[in-house]
Amino acid sequence: MGVPRAREGRGAGSQSPPRGRCLHPFRWGSQDRGRGEGLALSPLLPGVPPPPAMGVPRDRGGRGAGSQSTPRGGCLLPPRLGSQQPAGEEGLVLSPRLAGDASPCCDGSPKSQGVKRGWLSVPTSRGVPPPPAIGVLIARGGRGAGSQSLPRGWSFTPLRWGS
């Protein structure tokens, strides 16, 4: 019963790096460059430069306020979606399309309890079409088993915060 654990107390599937190593993202699922299907992590090997992190913006030039250069002995971690930490990160915001001046239900009632922690719920402006959702695939056609359509009246809206 239970999950067998390694000697160091790490369970199966643990993604903690060994001491002195960093985890760097790389894509898999396709041999074509830039057409990966997911995100995996690989250890940083001594003397070998890390692969470029895909999708991580980097400033050109020095180590200014917006610089994403790797810290002195460490790793450049990929940004987290939906994080509440003020670190200039990007995320997706779940926003309802509301008619008139109605406001979303965010008072802890049953309608608002399905909202994930770290997501903001904001209404879109009336009369202004929402911007296209970046990186969200919506199934065309009916609501079959693989459909990723949102409930009627809701849309994904990209939002930047933190800087």
From Swiss-Prot:
UniProt-annotated stretches for the region Disordered: 1-163
Domain of life: Eukaryota
Biased composition (Basic and acidic residues): 1-10
Listed name of the protein: Putative uncharacterized protein FLJ45355
Record organism: Homo sapiens (Human)
